[in-house]
A protein has these predicted regions:
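Cell-envelope/glycan interface and biosynthesis
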Residues: 1-139
C-alpha cells in the first residue's frame, strides 16, 4: 500500500509517513506535540479536494477576492477569512505528501522551522504556517 495510516488520524505516502512519525517522536522528546489538524488535512482524495474546494469557492465574481482557475473557469473565494485551497488534483495533499499541522504557531511553529528539514519536510508557503510538504530525505 502506498498510503500509510498515521496516528492519531490521517494517511500519508509511505516515505512521508515514516518521516512524519520520526519527526513527531523527536518533537515529543522536546516537549512539542505534532498532530494533523484533522484526518482530511493529510492525504485527500480528488473527491475530498473537490468537495472542500466547492465549499470555499464560487463562480460568481467577488470584487477583490482571491481567485483560482479550475477547468478553464475562474473561481472566487467566498470569504477572505477562509484559507486558500488548491484546485482538485493540484494539491500535495492529493499525493499524500502534505500535512496541515494543528496549532502551528508559537513553540510548535518554532520547533518545525528549526527541525522539519532534518526529516524531509518544508514549509511551502510562509502565509500558511500550518502547511508542510514532504520533499524527501537524503539517501
Amino acid at each position: 500500500e502506498m498510503l500509510v495510516d498515521i496516528k492519531p488520524y490521517g494517511k500519508l505516502y509511505v516515505e512521508a509517513a515514516a518521516a512524519w512519525m520520526d519527526m513527531k517522536q523527536a518533537a515529543k522528546q522536546d516537549g512539542v506535540v505534532l498532530k494533523p489538524t484533522s484526518s482530511g488535512d493529510t492525504y485527500r482524495s480528488y473527491e475530498m479536494q473537490e468537495r472542500a474546494f466547492l465549499q470555499r469557492y464560487q463562480k460568481e465574481p467577488i470584487a477583490g477576492a482571491s481567485t483560482r482557475t479550475w477547468n478553464g473557469v475562474k473561481w472566487y473565494i467566498k470569504s477572505p477569512k477562509l484559507a486558500p485551497l488548491a484546485v482538485p488534483g493540484g494539491s500535495w495533499h492529493n499525493l499524500g505528501l502534505a500535512c496541515d499541522v494543528a496549532n502551528a504557531s508559537g513553540p510548535i511553529l518554532a520547533w518545525l522551522v528549526a527541525n522539519e528539514d532534518k526529516f524531509g519536510w518544508t514549509h511551502e508557503l510562509d502565509s500558511e504556517p500550518w502547511h508542510i510538504v514532504f520533499f524527501g530525505t537524503k539517501a
